[in-house]
Amino acid sequence: HLATRTALHAQNVITPMTEFGHNIGDDYWLATYTELTAYWQKLASESPRMVLDTIGYTAEGRPHLMAIITSPANHANLEQHKTNARRLALANDISETEARELSQTAKAVVWIDGGLHATEVLGAAQLMEMAYQMVSLDDAETQRFLDDVVTLLVHANPDGMELVSGWYMREPDPMQRSTGGIPRLYQKYVGHDNNRDSYMVTQPETENISRIMFREWYPQIMYNHHQTGPSGTVLF
């Protein structure tokens, strides 16, 4: 299965192994948000399927990035696809007949985030891996996703990723690395309670995400990734 998938990577974009010296998910290695940013910038520069948008800034002043991944043809009409999603979501200037007709041609908008709780490190890892897979694979299933869907990838807590990954990688002996014992909150003001800020919207990251989801793009599907662990780790 892996050999088959590898053979389908026909798009000429930089691989995680070339960029990091690691595959995403390798043991005893975590990328920082700075490294994620640099990698996404390279993917966006190398592939017409991906555009990077800065949706705001974090509590510590980092650019809060959103990767928009879809087919080149959809990118050429991105504002129209955004308008279609908005009209279908709000339904205040469209009849049922018009909505049903529009739904036949409008693109699905899918939001995928990760890393909200920064010690749940798989969420950030899947954002890097998914971006790479979506811009590099040329199999029929990926092409269908690109044609039918506008995918929005967002790291929900960039400051936390920078802190946790930096703390983890500071230890030169890989066997001694741990995400435990971090000396400060992995979101500057609310720490692990950043998910509960979704109803208060007091933090800049929550403001950025809420604006995109409920004022600009109105995704029909939203994946907010979390992780159980440390034993029997599951991404959900």
Task: Locate the predicted segments by residue.
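M14 metallocarboxypeptidase catalytic domain recognition
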Residues: 1-236
